[in-house]
Swiss-Prot record:
It comes from the Bacteria. Under oxidizing conditions two disulfide bonds are formed involving the reactive cysteines. Under reducing conditions zinc is bound to the reactive cysteines and the protein is inactive. GO terms for biological process: protein refolding. Belongs to the HSP33 family. The keyword Transmembrane does not apply. One of its GO terms (molecular function) is unfolded protein binding. Pfam families: HSP33. Coiled coil: none annotated. This is 33 kDa chaperonin. Disulfide bonds join C225-C227, C258-C261. InterPro entries: Heat_shock_Hsp33, Heat_shock_Hsp33_C, Heat_shock_Hsp33_N, Hsp33_helix_hairpin_bin_dom_sf. HAMAP family: HslO. The lineage of its organism: Bacteria, Pseudomonadati, Pseudomonadota, Gammaproteobacteria, Alteromonadales.
Length: 286
């Protein structure tokens, strides 16, 4: 299977668009820096695939965030990305999590926030409750509320690989529900193992061999963290200088860590003085 690729496709005889994403390296980079319980590894894989599929529907340059929050043992799971399919993510949890825990078990009274931030234009935010049995169903609910277009998703993850498929009726073609339902029935026969092991062309042939499918050029998906020494310096400047200097006196340096990729940035006394004087550290060493 080609790793970390998203495919978009259309049906020549139906007003429906589709997407298929297969992830491995980017998924491993999201979960590899943290000791996530198996159920959280699976959830983050599904969330990563869902965010990639959502990102492919964007019609602008900018950022996307898909965030799950609640009052259960998992307080946060989030994937952030952009229109270039560059993604990163984290989760926060407390205590033991059962391998078969449901969304309700993990998040309690939870909700999903999808935030779209164009480089130009106004930010959009949609919120839906995590009151469906699966993450895929919750994302479908978001589309039903925000775009009011019939949409279906299938999400899979096993701690090693993640994958997903997406179908949606094209805008202004909502009366073609019969075609959409037929294609959903075909797509629902997909198995995780097929998405994890087969090339996209073979998957589409197995599902839609009686349909005329037009497959577009593949899009690479990657893990990309946006942390930097400069951003860490800017964060330090928001802290009271006396507090930072107390840490410096005790430890000899100030360490800033990234939650997403676990990168560490060290700042010594000269750096700290430069940050509060000029807003930037005096050197560029990590």
């Amino acid at each position: 299977m080609t790793q970390d690729i998203l495919h978009r496709y259309l049906f020549d005889n139906a007003d429906v668009r589709g997407e298929l994403v297969q992830l491995q390296n980017s998924y491993q980079q999201v979960i590899g820096s943290h000791a996530y319980p198996p159920v959280l590894q699976t959830l983050l894989g599904e969330l990563l695939a869902a965010t990639s599929l959502l990102t492919a529907t964007l019609k602008f340059s900018g950022d996307i965030s898909v965030q799950l929050q609640g009052n259960g043992p998992v307080s946060l799971a989030v994937i952030n990305g952009n229109n270039l399919q560059q993604l990163r993510g984290i989760a926060r949890w407390d205590g033991e999590l059962a391998d078969d825990a449901s969304l309700a078990d993990l998040f309690g009274q939870g909700y999903m926030v999808i935030t779209l931030t164009p480089d130009e234009g106004e930010r959009y935010q949609g919120v839906v409750a995590l009151d469906k049995p699966t993450l895929a169903a919750c994302v479908e609910d978001y589309f039903n509320q925000s775009e009011q277009l019939p949409t279906a998703l299938w999400l899979f993850a096993d701690g090693k690989q993640a994958a997903g498929m997406f179908l949606q009726i094209l805008p202004s073609q909502e009366d073609h529900n019969a075609d959409f339902e037929h294609l959903c029935q075909l797509t629902a026969t997909i198995k995780a193992e097929e998405l994890f092991t087969l090339e996209a062309q073979e998957v589409l042939h197995r599902l839609y061999h009686q349909e005329e499918v037009r497959l577009f050029d593949p899009i690479e998906v990657s893990f990309k963290c946006t942390c930097s020494r400069e951003r860490s310096a800017a964060a330090i400047k928001t802290i009271d200088q006396a507090e930072v200097e107390a840490i410096l006196a005790e430890d000899g340096n100030v360490e800033m860590g990234c939650e997403y990729c676990n990168a560490k940035y060290l700042f010594d006394a000269i750096d700290i003085a430069s940050i509060y004087a000029n807003g930037t550290a005096s050197n560029t060493q990590q």
